[in-house]
From Swiss-Prot:
Its EC number is 6.2.1.12. Transmembrane segments: none annotated. Gene3D superfamilies: 3.30.300.30, 3.40.50.980, Luciferase, Domain 3. Its cofactor is Mg(2+). Belongs to the ATP-dependent AMP-binding enzyme family. Signal peptide: none annotated. This is Probable 4-coumarate--CoA ligase 2. The keyword Transferase does not apply. Pathway: Phytoalexin biosynthesis; 3,4',5-trihydroxystilbene biosynthesis; 3,4',5-trihydroxystilbene from trans-4-coumarate: step 1/2.
Length: 551
């Protein structure tokens, strides 16, 4: 719908504005799961252990009590470096219940990656597995000088005995999750929270370009997006639906879907710590999963893998794909394979939008569309050349305003002002348009950001890594299309004068410093000079399609 404001064109949602509850996230969650105490809310996909709503609610409050005993204060940060585990849910909500902030990162991150993500928000507490602790313990005081307590969470195959030994030998800094929740769940204060100003979580995003930044999302941001999404998505769920929980909880897509939306709606979530396609299919069959939230690489497996035919997936009703665009070709292949019985939907968003802004309504799918604008939001589409507001059907940068727009980037006013304009619109960096039915189409993803397996890989981060090598004079990183993976990083390097360096030497040096999905699967090429504009901006597009010989 078009709205004219001061002579400028804006677009509103087809849905009427909704009332956003004025409650902190954990209060909202506890209210809903306490109403169905005997329902199975979580299932450990490795051990098959089931957790009732009553147990989860009690454990949330026990985490709050445990943190209160550790003297947590409003605004203190608890860094979560965990794979998907049932304990993630009470740790997340228990921290928020005490007015704390959870900051979530990939447990596969190296020390170097943790140092410029989680360490930048000065966490007072960490929640980790034994494997993560072993990785960080020697650098703990250097990388995390602010940390006072490390909470070790058990995982299948790891014994409590191992954790117990660590708690006795680490100068009191380490405790087990079981020690944290060894209380009655009653002794914690009610913390007053400013819903619109107080940060609840700090996930990390690169925005459209640059290094990763902490994204400050308030309780109001999260509650708003929960209800905005439910307005469109409620008809897609049935009362006793079971959902697969394989998307990473540290990613805003998985966080909002499983830790908030599904838990609030009371759907049982079958949790997988690490994605394995065969186990994933087996769990769908075993638990008669109805809905699975996926990323395009998983969609491609559904479309093409012969393994799919070995499982009874008749319970599966809907696949919801996000984090990166899903091609129409893959969508058609899945529909053909499942004889049209499987609904495939997409949405669009960003970490900075908490995360959803467009969702395809049930039964109203339009090919190639990112969906319809969720309620309580305003859109303007601006010309990349002139900055003027454009009309229906005209292609420009999509900008979003609403209660789901982030507070800002953590301790980075400059970066915040670059993406949120003076009127409060978040500039997505993506080019698109809206049609006469209110469906939005993304025609050009942010040019610089590499999307690998649904994860964001900022070229600037990898360029900084390459440039730190003593023999590298200049570097540029671009995304290379790579089938099921989406895009993979490809590096271009200028070697310092009078130095010699091979691709293998550089890869062997770089890969241990970065997560697996950031590896240079597109290779590293050596060239005489990196193309740049007159202002010194890297001309990545000039390098996208060239394949120079490797030295």
């Amino acid at each position: 719908m078009i709205r004219m404001i001061k002579g400028q064109i804006y677009f509103t949602s087809k849905y009427p504005n909704i009332i956003i509850p004025e409650k902190p996230i954990p209060h909202l969650i506890l209210k809903h799961i306490r109403s169905k105490p005997d329902q199975v809310l979580l299932v450990d996909g490795l051990t098959f252990k089931e957790y009732s709503s009553h147990f989860v609610a009690d454990t949330i409050e026990k985490v709050a009590c445990g943190l209160n005993k550790l003297n947590i204060k409003k605004g203190d940060v608890l860094g979560v470096i965990l794979p998907n585990l049932p304990e993630y849910v009470p740790i997340f909500h228990g921290t928020l219940l005490m007015g704390g902030i959870t900051s979530l990162v990939n447990p596969d991150y190296t020390i170097e990656e943790l140092s410029h993500t989680l360490a930048t928000v000065s966490p007072r507490y960490l929640a980790v597995t034994l494997a993560v602790y072993e990785k960080i313990k020697n650098d703990l005081k250097r990388v995390f000088p602010s940390v006072e307590k490390v909470i070790l969470v058990d995982i299948a195959g790891q014994t409590l005995k191992e954790i117990g030994q660590l708690t006795l030998s680490s100068d009191g800094i380490v405790m087990s999750f079981n020690q944290l929740i060894n209380n009655n769940g009653k002794d914690y204060p009610i913390v007053r929270i400013d819903l619109k100003k107080d940060t609840a979580i700090i996930p990390f995003s690169s925005g459209t370009t640059g290094l990763f930044k902490g994204v400050c999302l308030s309780h109001h941001n999260l509650v708003s997006n929960t209800h905005q999404t439910q307005t469109v998505e409620t008809t897609n769920y049935k009362k006793n639906d079971t959902v697969m929980g394989q998307l990473p909880f540290f990613h805003i897509y998985g966080l909002m879907t499983y830790l908030i939306l599904m838990v609030k709606q009371g759907h049982c979530v079958v949790i997988l710590p690490k994605f394995e396609f065969v186990r994933f299919l087996d769990l769908i069959q075993k638990y008669k999963v109805a809905i699975s939230f996926i990323v395009p690489p998983i969609a491609i497996m559904f479309a093409k893998s012969p393994i799919v035919d070995k499982f009874d997936l008749s319970s599966l009703r809907t696949l919801f794909s996000g984090a990166a665009p899903l091609s129409r070709e893959v969508e058609d292949l899945i529909k053909e394979r499942f004889k049209g019985k499987l609904i495939i939907k997409q949405g669009y968003g960003a970490t900075e939008l908490s995360p959803a802004c467009f969702v395809i309504p049930s039964g109203l799918i339009k090919s190639g569309s990112a969906g319809i604008l969720l309620p309580n939001q305003l859109v303007k589409i601006i010309s990349p050349e002139t900055g003027e507001n454009l009309g229906m059907g005209e292609k420009g940068e999509i900008c979003i305003k609403g209660p789901n727009v982030m507070l800002g980037y953590y301790n980075n006013e400059k970066a915040t002002n670059e993406v949120i304009d003076k009127d409060g619109f978040f500039k997505t960096g993506d080019i698109g348009y809206v049609d006469e039915d209110g469906y939005y189409f993304i025609v050009d993803r942010s040019k610089e950001l590499i999307k690998c397996k649904g994860f964001q890989v900022p070229p600037a981060e990898l360029e900084a890594l390459l440039l730190s090598h003593p023999k590298v004079a200049d570097a540029c990183v671009v995304g290379l299309s790579k089938g099921d993976m989406g895009e993979v990083p490809r590096g271009f390097v200028v070697i310092k004068q009078n130095e010699s360096l091979t691709e293998k030497e550089l890869l062997d040096w770089a890969h241990p410093k970065i997560a697996n999905y950031k590896h240079f699967r597109g290779g590293i090429f050596f060239i005489p000079a990196i193309p740049k504009s007159a202002t010194g901006k890297l001309l990545r597009k000039n390098l996208k399609d060239i394949n120079p010989p490797k030295l």
